[in-house]
Amino acid sequence: MECPNCHKNASRVIDSRPSDENRAIRRRRECENCGFRFTTFERVERSPLLVIKNDGTREAFNRDKILHGVMMAAQKRPISSEQLDTLVDHVENEIRKQGLNEISSKDIGNLVMKELANLDDVAYIRFASIYRQFKDVSGFMEAMEDMMAKHDKE
């Protein structure tokens, strides 16, 4: 690894440990040329994931957009930020498990709704009202009936 101080390619690892909840490895290095110590991180490089929007355009997957959407739906609900982070992790992991390079925004929305339905009914309905773009009360009532039918099965 190149030393950021003297730019020579001679360094050795003097310490290595897990970081970022085991998603990275933190390595402490020392340059064998000048003795400068520096830190590097090693992470798994995931293949880029593209989202196919409703208009057919493509954009890079952005977990922060999903997190923002579920945070808006969960406003003033007894849901912690950790629960929302976990929800978004589940959605992203489910997408990556499918092994696809592209996924439609509709499929992402369905995954989010599935996760929200298991977390909080009100947040689910709020998210569904925006995601499904209800045109009238009947669409909203249909989502409510779906939620109530789910509870009847439990």
Curated annotation (Swiss-Prot):
Its cofactor is Zn(2+). GO terms for biological process: negative regulation of DNA-templated transcription. It comes from the Bacteria. It holds the Pfam family Zn_ribbon_NrdR. Keywords: ATP-binding, DNA-binding, Metal-binding, Nucleotide-binding, Repressor, Transcription, Transcription regulation, Zinc, Zinc-finger. Binds 1 zinc ion. This is Transcriptional repressor NrdR. GO terms for molecular function: ATP binding; DNA binding; zinc ion binding. A zinc finger (unnamed) spans 3-34. It comes from Lactobacillus gasseri (strain ATCC 33323 / DSM 20243 / BCRC 14619 / CIP 102991 / JCM 1131 / KCTC 3163 / NCIMB 11718 / NCTC 13722 / AM63). The gene is nrdR. NCBIfam families: transcriptional regulator NrdR. Belongs to the NrdR family. Residues 49-139 form the ATP-cone domain. Negatively regulates transcription of bacterial ribonucleotide reductase nrd genes and operons by binding to NrdR-boxes. Residues 1-22 are annotated as: Disordered.
